[in-house]
């Protein structure tokens, strides 16, 4: 999982989710796209 200051979709199957005030990107097709903000 990458932690970066700005997160966004990197492909069509990425989903943006908010959990406990943090923004996550999860991707089933390409798990390398997992990101977290903050």
Swiss-Prot record:
Any one GO molecular-function label of the UniProt entry: structural constituent of ribosome
CC annotations in GO: ribonucleoprotein complex; ribosome
GO biological process: translation
Keyword Ribonucleoprotein assigned: yes
Keyword Ribonucleoprotein: yes
Domain of life: Bacteria
UniProt keywords, alphabetically: Ribonucleoprotein, Ribosomal protein
Coiled coil: none
Family of this protein: Belongs to the bacterial ribosomal protein bL36 family.
Protein name: Large ribosomal subunit protein bL36
Originating organism: Chloroherpeton thalassium (strain ATCC 35110 / GB-78)
Lineage start: Bacteria, Pseudomonadati, Chlorobiota, Chlorobiia, Chlorobiales
Gene name for this UniProt entry: rpmJ
């Amino acid at each position: 999982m990458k932690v970066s200051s700005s997160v966004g979709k990197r492909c069509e199957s990425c989903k943006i989710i908010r959990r406990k005030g943090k923004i996550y990107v999860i991707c089933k097709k390409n798990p390398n796209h997992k990101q977290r903000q903050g």
